[in-house]
Amino acid sequence: MENLVEIKYNQTGQSKLINEYGMREMQARAFEKRNSQYLLVKAPPASGKSRALMFIGLDKLINQGLKKVIVAVPERSIGSSFKNTELKSYGFFADWRIDPRNNLTTAGGDSSKVNAFVRFMESDDEILVCTHSTLRFAYEKLDDKVFDNCLLAIDEFHHVSADTNS
């Protein structure tokens, strides 16, 4: 069968080169905006968006005075993108480290995930990964003020509903 559709992109390899901090071009561009209150990172699949969030989250914790980083993903399998990651060996100033009890994307009951989220918010722990669903249900149990001084990152933002009950 004849190939009816073929798309060729002008590939230079530039997007895979890393800078002195171990960042790809897109990650470095996102990191330049790390002082912004709101960020929307839009990039193709497998371009390093999760790692860009790690760089920004660590900077917010270490250099900008935020107390917590919460990453919400649409489904548990995506949570593995936020596992412990060595960044210092590539030139960054810190590694991404998440306590296993704060990775709420592993198998287990939903109510215990919500309780674990509440425990995280009451603790000195800094990084948590959960599903959108866990965030939504935990949010209902918490006062809005506990989210002050937190970076709340919504991965796969297009999955989020605008419904006020969601």
Regions found by a protein language model. Name each.
Residues 2-42:
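Conserved pre-motif I regulatory segment
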Residues 36-57:
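Walker A/P-loop
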Residues 50-54, 60-61, 65-92, 97, ...:
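Conserved Walker A/P-loop ATP-binding site and its immediately adjacent core
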Residues 62-64, 119-122, 143-146:
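Conserved catalytic network of the ASCE P-loop NTPase/AAA+ motor domain
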Residues 67-68, 123-128, 148-151:
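Loop/turn-to-beta-strand initiation segments
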Residues 80, 137, 162:
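Alpha-helical elements of the RecA-like P-loop NTPase motor core of helicases
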Residues 91-139:
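Inter-Walker segment of RecA-like/P-loop motor cores
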Residues 132-134, 143-166:
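SF2 helicase catalytic motif II
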